[in-house]
Regions:
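Conserved N-terminal beta1-alpha1 strand-loop-helix module at the mouth
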Residues: 1-74, 81-82
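Short acidic/polar active-site loop segments enriched in Thr and Asp
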Residues: 85
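Short beta-strand and adjacent tight-turn residues that come in two discontinuous sequence segments
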Residues: 89
């Protein structure tokens, strides 16, 4: 099955991410999508929207440990709170 993915890099704020996902959800509700569709928003926007069943969320980055004193990093334990199962490499 093909995968369609969008990596936001640092191009969206929480508000613009929410608006983008809202429009994407509307499109997916009215169109048959057989592909797996993923978005990779900024880490500050991981909880700023709701996904429909055809859309999956991933993280742009993660540090290779569950947690610890790693300034500025995102640990796997933190991503688990958002039910993140996919990370860009």
């Amino acid at each position: 099955m093909p995968i369609i993915a969008s990596n936001f890099k640092t191009n969206h704020t929480r508000k613009s991410t929410s608006l983008f996902v809202e429009k994407l959800n509307e499109y997916l509700k009215s169109n048959e999508a057989l592909d797996e569709i993923y978005i990779f928003p900024t880490s500050t926007s991981l909880d700023s929207f709701e996904l429909n069943s055809k859309l999956f969320i991933g993280a742009q980055n993660a540090y290779h440990t569950k947690n610890g004193s790693f300034t500025g990093e995102i640990g796997l334990e933190q991503l688990e709170e958002f039910d993140i199962k996919t990370i860009l490499i």
